[in-house]
Swiss-Prot record:
Heterodimer of an alpha and a beta subunit. Beta-5 (ITGB5) associates with alpha-V (ITGAV). Interacts with MYO10. Interacts with DAB2. Integrin ITGAV:ITGB5 interacts with FBLN5 (via N-terminus). ITGAV:ITGB5 interacts with CCN3. Interacts with tensin TNS3; TNS3 also interacts with PEAK1, thus acting as an adapter molecule to bridge the association of PEAK1 with ITGB5. (Microbial infection) Integrin ITGAV:ITGB5 interacts with adenovirus type C penton protein. Keywords: Calcium, Cell adhesion, Cell membrane, Disulfide bond, EGF-like domain, Glycoprotein, Host cell receptor for virus entry, Host-virus interaction, Integrin, Magnesium, Membrane, Metal-binding, Phosphoprotein, Receptor, Repeat, Signal, Transmembrane, Transmembrane helix. Belongs to the integrin beta chain family. Ca(2+) 1 binds at residues 149, 152-153, 362. Disulfide bonds join 28-46, 36-463, 39-64, 49-75, 202-211, 259-300, 401-413, 433-461, 465-484, 476-487, 489-498, 500-530, 513-528, 522-533, 535-548, 550-571, 555-569, 563-574, 576-585, 587-610, 594-608, 602-613, 615-625, 628-631, 635-682, 641-661, 644-657, 690-714. InterPro entries: I-EGF_1, Integrin_beta_N, Integrin_bsu, Integrin_bsu_cyt_dom, Integrin_bsu_tail, Integrin_bsu_tail_dom_sf, Integrin_bsu_VWA, Integrin_dom_sf. Ca(2+) 2 binds at residues 184, 242, 244, 246-247. PANTHER family: INTEGRIN BETA SUBUNIT, INTEGRIN BETA-5. The lineage of its organism: Eukaryota, Metazoa, Chordata, Craniata, Vertebrata. GO terms for cellular component: cell surface; extracellular exosome; focal adhesion; integrin alphav-beta5 complex; integrin complex; phagocytic vesicle; plasma membrane; receptor complex. Residues 136-378 form the VWFA domain. This is Integrin beta-5. It is found in: Cell membrane.
Length: 799
């Protein structure tokens, strides 16, 4: 079932805020209206009685009351209470299929013309339907960046026309293709302007020394069904070189949009403008760097040679001008950009209606699939845009998409299939009355469509009884005009029947000019004359009422603005316009400002109060309560659904799974695209140590597109002993390696030390000397004596 508690809660808050003001208060009589026209402006429920003898002669305001009260008090058929209405002037039925021919009148939106008559404050509601018909003609203009960095891309698209036409003719029988190219403005600092670079800006560039002179934009091939012409034109092209990184592509986009005759856009065809580049664009005010101070005029400036002649004369176009001209000519812009610039161009899509962005491979090999994806994305959604909306008109939208659920405050449907019909309920309300006999015309147009609904608005701000006015009527004593049951007295006359002249002494009846005993005459803001108050004029506004007790300038203000500019001041109290509440009408009941891109109100973590999210989930914060570190994330929430489906073999009709997956649109796949920029990737570990992956995309309807793997990814479980041996072996190997390294280092060190020792030893030189402390082991002593034995003598040494 759809998620609606947040908007419902916001509406209940608005009603609760209004109840204290409405209880016991008759907004019609409290407004002190003194004419039929003033009465009708107070509130759409107020009515005026034009019966001559109705009510108290002194109480003019009693004529302005609720219709039921007027009837109860005796005013029968003379009640003025017009209501808003509309009348369908032209309503051709929706086509079911295009003929594939531009000559066929294909209707994708109905009705086509409506006349609306509005009473201020009174809403009127009508329905319109939009359908993307089958086999609708397609015009595709390929706009390519031919700066030097795109050379490999140019080489890869030389046969693009044939392949692209084959794929597109599977979607439509009437397809035409055109081609244009751009670089940048041929002035400094955007391009090389030195004389040596005039004919070849690539001089001195080693990788690619030859290229053509720089240029702004060239329209090379008008839209044609001859794909050979496209291929031939692409083969002729050569790249150029500019000086700075940004390119002048937005100049080219604008010219391709506004030069309708040159490009050849057909009236009855889907217009696709494919913009391919690998860098960021120049935008408005960048041209001042080159001395270009004239803003872009939004006009076509292609000469007979189909070259952009104002490139060096005007600044780059702004995003606002670009969006206006693309919408004006029903052109869907497709940004085909490299991945590193994806987010920049993604932000551009939020500022330029009808724009999509796709990631282009570095060599443009995926360009055909990219275009097909963008085409399917464009054809799967319908978004209403408003053209020339009058300032005093409020519009409210409610979308009913393919699921049959109504989404208040939304004017876009996504996820449509070709042939689906999207319905929109449009409510109009006038806030005030413009000058008399004013008629406004505005248009409702689906973005990128030729079809539109023209709405003519007239304002019901006069009373029917005003037609029968009686100048100098006898009912007014010949001194005033009788109109709608009252006398409008001529200057100098007063009284309900103009029976008194201004200045007559009526002091005896002065108490009739006091609101209560003891209070000042006419509340101190008027003179009592002819038994009634004549209120003073004030520079701040109007003073009125039977006792001059009311004014239209003493109400609450917000930032110095009376009733915040969203209401009317009546007798000291703000009467808020539809869509606003509060004492000073500063609180908007519009919940669209609280709706995120996924269609959820305050991320379902709070309620919308006065156009701002009030976060109620503990820990939630942010403009849309989108940040919540302590909240269960969407992956955890959707995991229950996925696990239930796995348990029950993917059958969502199981009662438990149906409850858990009631807001999910399930798609089973064999492989998950992990780099999808639009989807959120979730994964978790199962009980069997497998990894289960899924992605989800939140839809504006409150549901989610859930893409789930058919089977969890499970690897082969390794043997425990294998793991143990591997770990032990690794430790031993690391230890042995460390020991070997240590031994090697020690050996190297020892060898160096030994070599050093040997070197020093070889260089050493010593003298021969004896150690004085050294004694030889053999000593010789000489004894001088004579030995006589046996009459022999001996004279020698003894050892």
């Amino acid at each position: 079932m759809p998620r609606a508690p947040a908007p419902l809660y916001a509406c209940l808050l608005g009603l609760c805020a209004l109840l204290p003001r409405l209880a016991g208060l008759n907004i019609c009589t409290s407004g002190s209206a003194t004419s039929c026209e003033e009465c009708l402006l107070i509130h759409p429920k107020c009515a005026w009685c034009s019966k001559e003898d109705f009510g108290s002669p002194r109480s003019i305001t009693s004529r302005c009351d609720l219709r039921a009260n007027l009837v109860k008090n005796g005013c029968g058929g003379e009640i003025e209470s017009p209501a808003s209405s509309f009348h369908v002037l032209r309503s051709l039925p929706l086509s079911s299929k295009g003929s594939g021919s531009a000559g066929w009148d294909v209707i994708q939106m109905t009705p086509q013309e409506i006349a609306v008559n509005l009473r201020p404050g009174d809403k009127t509601t009508f329905q319109l339907q939009v359908r993307q018909v089958e086999d609708y003609p397609v015009d595709l203009y390929y706009l390519m960046d031919l700066s030097l960095s795109m050379k490999d891309d140019l080489d890869n698209i030389r046969s693009l026309g044939t392949k692209l036409a084959e794929e597109m003719r599977k979607l439509t029988s009437n397809f035409r293709l055109g081609f244009g190219s751009f670089v940048d403005k041929d002035i400094s600092p955007f391009s090389y302007t030195a004389p040596r670079y005039q004919t070849n800006p690539c001089i001195g560039y080693k990788l690619f020394p030859n290229c053509v002179p720089s240029f702004g934009f060239r329209h090379l091939l008008p839209l044609t069904d001859r794909v050979d012409s496209f291929n031939e034109e692409v083969r002729k092209q050569r790249v150029s070189r500019n000086r700075d990184a940004p390119e002048g592509g937005f100049d080219a986009v604008l010219q391709a949009a506004v030069c309708k005759e040159k490009i050849g856009w057909r009236k009855d065809a889907l217009h696709l403008l494919v913009f391919t580049t690998d860098d960021v664009p120049h935008i408005a005010l960048d041209g001042k760097l080159g001395g270009l101070v004239q803003p872009h005029d939004g006009q076509c400036h292609l000469n007979e040679a189909n070259e952009y002649t104002a490139s060096n004369q005007m600044d780059y176009p702004s995003l606002a001008l670009l969006g206006e001209k693309l919408a004006e000519n029903n052109i869907n812009l497709i940004f085909a950009v490299t991945k590193n610039h994806y987010m920049l161009y993604k932000n551009f899509t939020a500022l330029i209606p009808g724009t999509t962005v796709e990631i282009l491979d570095g060599d443009s090999k995926n360009i055909i699939q990219l275009i097909i994806n963008a085409y399917n994305s464009i054809r799967s959604k319908v978004e209403l845009s408003v053209w020339d909306q009058p300032e005093d008109l409020n519009l409210f939208f409610t979308a009913t998409c393919q699921d049959g659920v109504s989404y208040p405050g939304q004017r876009k449907c996504e996820g449509l299939k070709i042939g689906d019909t999207a319905s929109f309920e449009v409510s109009l309300e006038a806030r005030s009355c413009p000058s008399r006999h004013t008629e406004h015309v505005f248009a409702l147009r689906p973005v990128g469509f030729r079809d539109s609904l023209e709405v003519g608005v007239t304002y019901n701000c006069t009373c029917g009884c005003s037609v029968g006015l009686e100048p100098n009527s006898a009912r007014c004593n010949g001194s005033g005009t009788y109109v709608c049951g009252l006398c409008e007295c001529s200057p100098g006359y007063l009284g309900t029947r103009c029976e008194c002249q201004d200045g007559e002494n009526q002091s005896v009846y002065q108490n009739l000019c006091r609101e209560a005993e003891g209070k000042p005459l006419c509340s101190g803001r008027g003179d009592c004359s002819c038994n009634q108050c004549s209120c003073f004029e004030s520079e701040f506004g109007k003073i009125y009422g039977p006792f001059c007790e009311c004014d239209n300038f003493s109400c609450a203000r917000n930032k110095g603005v009376l009733c915040s500019g969203h209401g009317e001041c009546h007798c000291g109290e703000c009467k808020c316009h539809a869509g606003y509440i509060g004492d000073n009408c500063n609180c908007s009941t519009d919940i669209s400002t609280c709706r995120g891109r996924d269609g959820q109100i305050c991320s379902e973590r709070g309620h919308c109060l006065c156009g701002q999210c009030q976060c109620t989930e503990p820990g939630a914060f942010g403009e849309m309560c989108e940040k919540c570190p302590t909240c269960p994330d969407a992956c955890s929430t959707k995991r229950d659904c996925v696990e239930c489906l796995l348990l029950h073999s993917g059958k969502p009709d199981n009662q438990t799974c149906h409850s858990l997956c009631r807001d999910e649109v399930i798609t089973w796949v064999d492989t998950i695209v992990k780099d999808d920029q639009e989807a959120v990737l979730c994964f978790y570990k199962t009980a069997k140590d497998c990894v289960m992956m899924f992605t989800y995309v939140e839809l504006p309807s409150g549901k989610s597109n859930l893409t789930v793997l058919r089977e969890p990814e499970c690897g082969n479980t390794p043997n425990a002993m294998t793991i143990l041996l591997a770990v032990v072996g690794s430790i031993l190997l690391v230890g042995l390696a460390l020991l070997a390294i240590w031994k090697l280092l020690v050996t190297i060190h020892d060898r160096r030390e030994f070599a050093k020792f040997q070197s020093e030893r070889s260089r050493a030189r010593y003298e021969m000397a004896s150690n004085p402390l050294y004694r030889k082991p053999i000593s010789t002593h000489t004894v001088d004596f004579t030995f006589n034995k046996f009459n022999k003598s001996y004279n020698g040494t003894v050892d």
